[in-house]
Amino acid sequence: MNMNKLVKSSVATSMALLLLSNTANAEGKITPVSVKKVDDKVTLYKTTATADSDKFKISQILTFNFIKDKSYDKDTLVLKAAGNINSGYERPNPKDYDFSKIYWGAKYNVSISSQSNDSVNVVDYAPKNQNEEFQVQNTLGYTFGGDISISNGLSGGLNGNTAFSETINYKQESYRTTLSRNTNYKNVGWGVEAHKIMNNGWGPYGRDSFHPTYGNELFLAGRQSSAYAGQNFIAQHQMPLLSRSNFNPEFLSVLSHRQDGAKKSKITVTYQREMDLYQIRWNGFYWAGANYKNFKTRTFKSTYEIDWENHKVKLLDTKETENNK
């Protein structure tokens, strides 16, 4: 089969877009609010909300930490976004002869957006910068009067004045975390993207790697292999975990609410995976690979109402979106 014909045919096909919005079908649970009085000034209110997309194998676990501080003129909400995003990996057909393909999890996106007026703003977040470490770890600390600190590690930077702390800890082997370009006082987002992938000691390779003869050798097992196309990919267990299995995100955002503003506001939390199409073909002399970015996208959004006065949240809506090239 000719790869160029297949790609042209795929691109020529109109984009498939399916929007599903139905809160009744979403599996959402919200725990009762727990209250912890730190001292005569600070009280903490905590609740956890979960929402799942069984179809996309995406789950959101959101921990809402409300901080009521009498020494500060604003309400503070520390939101931890955790859960699971499946890679969507689709293995090759071992019977494919001279052409074969896989779909793999190339990038994961998480964003938090404040759907309100200027009374609610995003004032801090973690991670704050690009990170290429194997394991990302940050600790957020809140001290009296609204001071927020974010440090590397799981406990660094805290002191005796810390009234509240929260941590994030996730693994991203061969991937890197970047901050979304549209991060501002209303939105914050992160992308965890395949960055430096090794192939049996060769590489590193990325989504855009290219060799003038062999193309992108990201997951190609052998240039001169006599195996069928469907058996000439590197073994699944040799691929990075995030490319073939699941990503377990953990991100933090801090929202500030002006006390003379509206008592309720809305936020939208978005989890998304981008799947690339990776192909190999035999041209009669050697094998060559090609990677096509963002060939399939699966997005799961949940919208919550935030009750700042009673320190509660309510799931308003969920939406599943498919985007196929």
Curated annotation (Swiss-Prot):
Gene Ontology biological-process entries: cytolysis in another organism
Sample GO molecular function, one term: toxin activity
Signal peptide: 1-25
Alphabetical keyword list: Cytolysis, Hemolysis, Signal, Toxin, Virulence
One CC-aspect GO term: extracellular region
The protein's role, per its UniProt record: Toxin that seems to act by forming pores in the membrane of the cell. Has a hemolytic and a leucotoxic activity. Promotes host AMFR-mediated inflammation by mediating 'Lys-27'-linked ubiquitination of TAB3, TAK1-TAB3 complex formation and phosphorylation of TAK1/MAP3K7. In turn, activates host NF-kappa-B signaling pathway.
Family classification: Belongs to the aerolysin family.
Gene3D superfamilies referenced in this protein's UniProt entry, alphabetically: Leukocidin/porin MspA
NCBIfam families: hlyII
Keyword Signal recorded: yes
Protein name listed in UniProt: Gamma-hemolysin component B
The keyword Transport belongs to this UniProt entry's keyword annotation: no
Listed Pfam families: Leukocidin
Protein species of origin: Staphylococcus aureus (strain MRSA252)
SUBUNIT field: Toxicity requires sequential binding and synergistic association of a class S and a class F component which form heterooligomeric complexes. HlgB (class F) associates with either hlgA thus forming an AB toxin or with hlgC thus forming a CB toxin. Interacts with host AMFR.
